[in-house]
């Protein structure tokens, strides 16, 4: 089969991690950073269980906030990451390009840069020096991939077949623990939104009550 021929009725996928970590600047780091910057942070794309994604990822382009010098950063070799300092949170566009031989279109993801502890683990994060980790698990699916992509991914299986680790470790940040933490963060955010909606409802009802009780002259 020719390399530029698609493998029909076939689907092959690869998991990746798109995320960031951040921590407050130390006194020494503050002296070197812009005066308004408060944190050092890292945005990254990496494989699960230490997989070398450079075998099938050609480059990763990170689009930072326009206030940064050279906001479009192109990383063509691992680690696919950008390390910066800053003071605010914002959305980062992450564009992943594959090997030319794969004939696959680039994929775009968006990651919201997190700098400050939040959610159920807020106090734990503060106690650990303010280190924040925000990681998205993404599944890249190749439907009817070209022969080159199919062979490349088939010959380079991922992980050790034991699934996700129970707890996070420095070399393996994505785990059942992190997955649960992300779910807890979502639940926390949903509850906060519900509280806000209820507060506004009460304010509206109060205003309506005041209006109806005001005598008409």
Curated annotation (Swiss-Prot):
Coiled-coil portions: 180-214
Subcellular location: Cytoplasm; Nucleus
Family matches, as InterPro entries: YEAST_sf (IPR038704), YEATS (IPR005033), YEATS_dom (IPR055129)
Entry keyword set: Activator, Chromatin regulator, Coiled coil, Cytoplasm, DNA damage, DNA repair, Nucleus, Transcription, Transcription regulation
GO terms of molecular function: histone binding
Residue ranges constituting the YEATS domain according to the UniProt record: 6-156
A Pfam family that the UniProt record links to this protein: YEATS
Gene3D superfamilies noted in UniProt: YEATS domain (2.60.40.1970)
GO cellular component entries: cytosol; NuA4 histone acetyltransferase complex; nucleus; Swr1 complex
Signal sequence extent: none
Major localization class: cytoplasm
GO process terms (BP): chromatin remodeling; DNA repair; DNA repair-dependent chromatin remodeling; regulation of transcription by RNA polymerase II; transcription initiation-coupled chromatin remodeling
Comment, domains: The coiled-coil domain is required for assembly into the NuA4 complex.
General function of this protein: Component of the SWR1 complex which mediates the ATP-dependent exchange of histone H2A for the H2A variant HZT1 leading to transcriptional regulation of selected genes by chromatin remodeling. Component of the NuA4 histone acetyltransferase complex which is involved in transcriptional activation of selected genes principally by acetylation of nucleosomal histones H4 and H2A. The NuA4 complex is also involved in DNA repair. Yaf9 may also be required for viability in conditions in which the structural integrity of the spindle is compromised.
Recorded family membership: Belongs to the YAF9 family.
Subunit annotation: Component of the SWR1 chromatin-remodeling complex and of the NuA4 histone acetyltransferase complex.
Name of the protein in question: Protein AF-9 homolog
Organism expressing this protein natively: Schizosaccharomyces pombe (strain 972 / ATCC 24843)
């Amino acid at each position: 089969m020719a390399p530029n021929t698609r493998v029909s009725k076939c689907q092959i996928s690869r998991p990746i991690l798109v995320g960031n970590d951040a921590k407050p600047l130390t006194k020494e780091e503050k002296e070197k950073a812009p005066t308004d910057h408060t944190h050092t942070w890292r945005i990254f794309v990496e494989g699960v269980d230490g997989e070398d994604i450079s075998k099938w990822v050609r480059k990763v382009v990170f689009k930072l906030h326009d206030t940064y010098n050279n906001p479009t950063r192109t990383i063509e070799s691992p680690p696919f990451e950008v390390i910066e300092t800053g003071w605010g949170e914002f959305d980062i566009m992450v564009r992943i390009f594959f090997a030319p031989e794969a004939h696959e279109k680039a994929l775009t993801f968006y990651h919201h840069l997190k700098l400050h502890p939040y959610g159920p683990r807020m106090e734990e994060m503060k106690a650990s020096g303010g280190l924040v980790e925000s990681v998205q698990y993404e599944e890249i699916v190749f439907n009817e991939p070209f022969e080159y992509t199919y062979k490349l991914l088939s010959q380079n299986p991922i992980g050790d077949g034991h699934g996700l680790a129970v707890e996070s470790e420095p070399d393996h940040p994505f785990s059942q623990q992190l997955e649960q933490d992300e779910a807890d963060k979502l639940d926390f955010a949903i509850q906060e939104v519900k509280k806000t909606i209820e507060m506004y409802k009460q304010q509206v009802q109060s205003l309506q009550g005041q209006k109806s009780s005001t005598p008409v002259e």
